[in-house]
């Protein structure tokens, strides 16, 4: 049975409304020479069995290697099957904004719980209902700092994720704000002397990775003290959120804003995304926070309910009063993270974080035995840089053996010491002792 979405009467009614005689009139602005006047060259329709067979054939062309030893902002972690199962529920399976609270209580409650998790892990007072990703959350933090301080300069650590820095530059291009990048030292941490010299009375905020792109746990308390002395805000950006189960919360170390992504919770790597961004800050900055907030309230019958509140985005209020124009965001990804964190619990998250750090130590020992020394001396979580001689060559050779080796740092830091041999490698709970030993011995060979 064929399905015809529009009957001739339907088409006639729509044409009458728009004042057109024929459907072709709607395309009058397109020159005749550019119009296709023949049927599309498509293969005949396939039945379901043939279609799945063709899709499997195409999928088999992909080269897969799981788990990879590459992190660089997107990390391989185990996702419990129940996460995907709950995501498929009809009440949840959308990323769209829950504008009607009376029919969106489930989604709103999940976003409320998401905000709770974000605040618990970051040590902040308030969180919004998620951002697009970690990079845009970082850029929005810089914009918020400018609104709060009235200043037009942002100081960024060179060890912040390079793609976060690129997105930040894109956002600030339209505002005219100045971006000053300060180097990192031999330990992989931000150079505090250079930071102190760069921060002045024009500085709106200082932005550091925590941990940073090099896998190093940066000097957040010291950087926050420098920023505070100049009246600037401190922004911590976390791409590997599992680290927050082991490290001190950014808020406890002096950060005024904590941003990043929860990709590590409930979201597969999926070629780099999508992944939910998070944004948390102090209560005094609540009305300058971008996005929207899910809040708990009571209806006229006295029953607890959830609504969107303090939605200071331009779709809700006047553009000149809005703090952002974030629209339909990563709500479904945020739901996945919320489910995963609920399953882990406080103790489970701490155990997962310790396991990740333990696997990173195991990788470090194995690589040192293989003659590949660590490049940086700073403290690390589950990611670190090794000197493998020729990083690009090692990556290419290991790819032929079905191993994704890591990220050559020279792609982003061509002038850094040991740049040619520097390979950024991550180890998570998915990398068992045998796999780590295989990786190290293969690199050595």
Curated annotation (Swiss-Prot):
It comes from Anaeromyxobacter sp. (strain K). One of its GO terms (molecular function) is glycine dehydrogenase (decarboxylating) activity. Coiled coil: none annotated. Its EC number is 1.4.4.2. The keyword Oxidoreductase applies. Belongs to the GcvP family. N-terminal subunit subfamily. It is an enzyme of class 1 (oxidoreductase). InterPro entries: GcvPA (IPR023010), GDC-P_N (IPR049315), GDC_P (IPR020581), PyrdxlP-dep_Trfase (IPR015424), PyrdxlP-dep_Trfase_major (IPR015421), PyrdxlP-dep_Trfase_small (IPR015422). The glycine cleavage system catalyzes the degradation of glycine. The P protein binds the alpha-amino group of glycine through its pyridoxal phosphate cofactor; CO(2) is released and the remaining methylamine moiety is then transferred to the lipoamide cofactor of the H protein. This is Probable glycine dehydrogenase (decarboxylating) subunit 1. It catalyses: N(6)-[(R)-lipoyl]-L-lysyl-[glycine-cleavage complex H protein] + glycine + H(+) = N(6)-[(R)-S(8)-aminomethyldihydrolipoyl]-L-lysyl-[glycine-cleavage complex H protein] + CO2. GO terms for biological process: glycine decarboxylation via glycine cleavage system; nucleoside metabolic process. HAMAP family: GcvPA (MF_00712). The keyword Nucleotidyltransferase does not apply. It comes from the Bacteria. The glycine cleavage system is composed of four proteins: P, T, L and H. In this organism, the P 'protein' is a heterodimer of two subunits. It holds the Pfam family GDC-P. Keywords: Oxidoreductase.
């Amino acid at each position: 049975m064929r399905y015809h979405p529009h009957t001739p009467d339907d088409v006639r009614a729509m044409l009458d409304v728009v004042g057109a005689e024929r459907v072709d009139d709607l395309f009058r602005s397109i020159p005749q020479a550019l119009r296709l006047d023949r049927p599309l060259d498509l293969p005949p329709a396939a039945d379901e069995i043939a279609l799945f067979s063709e899709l499997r054939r195409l999928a088999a062309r992909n080269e897969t290697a799981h788990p990879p030893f590459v992190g660089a902002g997107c990390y391989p972690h185990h996702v419990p099957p129940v996460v995907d199962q709950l995501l498929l529920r009809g009440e949840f399976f959308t990323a769209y904004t829950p504008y009607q609270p009376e029919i969106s209580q489930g989604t709103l409650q999940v976003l409320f719980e998401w905000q709770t998790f974000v605040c618990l892990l970051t040590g902040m007072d308030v969180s919004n209902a998620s951002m697009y990703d970690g990079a845009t959350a970082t850029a929005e933090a810089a914009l918020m700092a400018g609104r709060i301080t009235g200043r037009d300069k942002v100081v960024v650590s060179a060890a912040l994720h390079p793609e976060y820095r690129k997105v930040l530059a894109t956002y600030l291009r339209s505002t005219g704000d100045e971006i000053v990048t300060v180097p990192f030292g031999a330990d992989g941490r931000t150079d505090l002397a250079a930071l102190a010299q760069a921060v002045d009375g024009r500085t709106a905020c200082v932005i550091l990775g925590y941990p940073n792109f090099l896998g190093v746990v940066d000097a957040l308390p010291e950087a926050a003290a420098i920023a505070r002395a100049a009246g600037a805000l401190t922004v911590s950006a976390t791409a590997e959120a599992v680290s927050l189960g082991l490290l001190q919360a950014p808020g406890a170390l002096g950060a005024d804003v904590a941003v990043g992504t929860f990709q590590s919770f409930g979201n597969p790597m999926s070629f780099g995304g999508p992944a939910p961004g998070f944004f948390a800050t102090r209560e005094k900055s609540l009305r300058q926070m971008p996005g929207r907030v899910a809040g708990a309230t009571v209806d006229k019958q006295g029953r607890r309910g959830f609504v969107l509140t303090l939605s200071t985005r331009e779709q809700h209020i006047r553009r000149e009063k809005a703090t952002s124009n974030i629209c339909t965001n990563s709500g479904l990804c945020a739901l996945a993270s919320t489910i995963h964190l609920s399953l882990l619990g406080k103790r489970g998250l701490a155990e997962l974080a310790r396991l990740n750090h333990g696997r990173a130590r195991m990788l470090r020992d194995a690589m040192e035995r293989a003659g590949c020394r660590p490049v940086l001396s700073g403290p690390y979580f589950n990611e670190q840089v090794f000197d493998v001689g020729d990083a690009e060559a090692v990556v290419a050779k290991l790819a032929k053996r079905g191993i994704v080796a890591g990220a050559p740092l020279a792609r982003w830091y061509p002038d850094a010491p040991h740049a040619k041999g520097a390979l950024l490698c991550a180890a998570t709970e998915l990398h068992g002792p045998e796999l780590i030993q295989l990786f190290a011995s293969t690199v050595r060979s």
